[in-house]
């Protein structure tokens, strides 16, 4: 399937989930409890990326998809839900490993984040190959603002987009609609970083 897409000039990305294992039918805690911490997520126990073997598990999985199946890129689901102290080092380590693969094979490999924290510092669409950064972020701000404008729904995280037209304009001009302002959905906690210096290609 991927070869057929490539023959037609199409890239193929795979959506991968490294922020949690399934909450039901997941027996990994019984056989490998070191994979988890005492922290909890909406999807079960938090993954213990401070453990070297656990980090290697995720990185090797990413490389497997990219090297053996020749996917052109990965979209990392909800990385803001990775529960580790400070900046999740797994993100940088994974990007560096993928960058090494891209350099070794001469391929263009793309890494895209879903990150509700709007972390501009981890994005660098110009780095070739990517080694420590990510080419782009799934920009939910733009979608959420349009959703509120078109449907009127403003509950939950949509609460932050009640001024939808202004958020749409800011997303088009600067990328993120939230760049460090207090978020009502997060009970006044600041959300996001300045993103106006990034090109449009950094936002999907």
Enumerate the language-model features and the residues they cover.
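Substrate-binding/active-site clefts of carbohydrate-active enzymes
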Residues: 1-70, 75-104, 121-122
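Conserved alpha/beta catalytic core and glycan-binding cleft of carbohydrate-active enzymes
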Residues: 91, 95-204
């Amino acid at each position: 399937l991927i070869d057929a897409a490539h023959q037609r000039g199409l890239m193929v990305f795979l959506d991968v989930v490294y922020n949690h294992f399934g909450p039901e039918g997941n027996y990994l805690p019984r056989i490998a409890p070191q994979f988890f911490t005492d922290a909890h997520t909406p999807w079960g126990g938090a993954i213990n990326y401070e453990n070297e073997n656990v980090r290697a598990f995720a990185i090797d999985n990413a490389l497997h998809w990219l090297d053996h199946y020749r996917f052109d890129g990965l979209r990392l689901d909800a990385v803001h839900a990775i529960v580790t102290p400070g900046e999740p080092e797994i993100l940088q380590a994974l990007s560096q490993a993928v960058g090494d693969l891209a350099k070794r094979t001469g391929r263009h490999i793309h890494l895209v984040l879903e990150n509700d924290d709007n972390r501009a510092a981890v994005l660098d669409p110009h780095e070739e190959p990517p080694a420590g950064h990510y080419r782009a972020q799934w920009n939910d701000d733009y979608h959420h603002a349009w959703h509120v404008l078109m449907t009127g729904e403003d509950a939950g995280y949509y609460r932050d987009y009640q001024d939808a037209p202004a958020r749409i304009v800011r997303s088009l001009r600067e990328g993120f609609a939230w760049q460090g302002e207090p978020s009502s959905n997060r009970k006044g906690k600041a959300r996001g970083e300045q993103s106006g210096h990034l090109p449009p290609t950094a936002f999907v």
